[in-house]
């Protein structure tokens, strides 16, 4: 269309509230999120390891990535594996590359090299504590989980050499409850369950993103907010997706706000 205003011009925002191309820092924290983050930080300070489990899109990665990004680099060495579905040796290589360990030599098994390297870091005069975070950990083979557990102990000092954070969906929580996973589960201080947002928290989540995007506060009418809350059941990624579709529909219809009527008439929302 000729002289069609952009979405930013039409709605009067600086950023799209639900865009994936810019990062909100800090992310939205519910009260439960804040408690989880505070407790997780305390555990890391004492060399502990833990899991965070919950439905895909619940906000696990966002919360822990923000926690990791704020760890003091003078005391912590961060290792982030974004995908737990790597083969056993590929996982060790990915960790080695982030630690600066040569991964192509065959004289010494890579797992042994990593164990020695991490132990050396832990026993150095100015020691630093590695924190290994693995996302999509429900895809990890049991052998890979055992490898990871072997990296977090320091036999010379009989103390923790590193901390392990594994993030996964509800399948990971079920896996950890199996008897054959007990050697792994006992090395984790706790499994934090990441719960969906309540309806009130969903509205707070949307309002927070609108505020961070410098968008009009009344972008979503109250009845539309209530419908989004009921439809998405507190699932953050779905809230983002539904919000994106509704704003696109409002833009197409030349509406400045998202109403309940617009929500009900949007055939792309399933």
State each model region's role.
Residues 1-7, 161, 183, 200, ...:
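C-terminal alpha-helical "lid" subdomain
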Residues 1-47:
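A short, basic N-terminal segment
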Residues 13-18, 76-78, 86-105:
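Conserved NTP-binding/hydrolysis module of P-loop NTPases
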Residues 81-84, 176, 189-202:
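Conserved AAA+ ATPase "SRH/arginine-finger" region at the nucleotide-binding site
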Residues 46-66:
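Walker A/P-loop nucleotide-binding motif
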Residues 68, 172-187:
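Short regulatory helix/loop adjacent to the ATP-binding pocket of P-loop NTPases
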Residues 49, 119, 126, 130-166, ...:
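Conserved Walker B catalytic segment
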Residues 41-42, 108-127:
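Conserved alpha-helical scaffold flanking the Walker A/P-loop in AAA+ ATPase domains
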């Amino acid at each position: 269309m000729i002289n069609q205003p952009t979405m930013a011009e039409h709605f009067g925002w600086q950023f799209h509230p639900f865009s994936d191309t810019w990062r909100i820092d800090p992310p939205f924290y519910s009260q439960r999120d804040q408690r989880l983050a505070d407790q997780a930080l305390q555990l890391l300070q004492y060399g502990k390891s833990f899991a965070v489990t919950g439905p895909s899109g619940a906000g696990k990665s966002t919360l822990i990535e923000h926690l990791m990004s704020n760890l003091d680099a003078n005391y912590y060495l961060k290792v982030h594996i974004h995908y737990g579905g790597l083969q056993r040796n590929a996982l060790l290589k990915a960790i080695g590359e982030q630690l600066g360990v040569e991964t192509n030599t065959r004289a010494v098994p890579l797992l042994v090299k990593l164990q020695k390297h991490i132990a050396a870091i832990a026993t150095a005069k100015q020691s630093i504590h590695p924190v290994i975070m693995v996302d999509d950990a429900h895809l990890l083979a049991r052998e890979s989980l055992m490898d990871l557990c072997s990296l977090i102990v320091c036999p010379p000092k009989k103390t923790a050499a590193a901390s392990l954070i594994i993030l996964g969906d509800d399948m990971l929580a079920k896996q950890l409850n199996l008897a054959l996973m007990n050697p792994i589960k006992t090395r984790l201080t706790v499994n934090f369950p990441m719960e969906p947002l309540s309806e009130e928290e969903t509205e707070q989540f949307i309002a927070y993103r609108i505020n961070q995007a410098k968008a009009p506060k009344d972008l979503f009418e109250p009845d539309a907010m209530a419908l989004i809350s009921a439809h998405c059941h507190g699932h953050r990624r779905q809230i983002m997706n539904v919000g994106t579709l509704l704003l696109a529909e409002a833009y197409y219809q030349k509406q400045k706000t998202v109403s309940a009527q617009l929500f009900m008439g949007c055939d792309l929302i399933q």
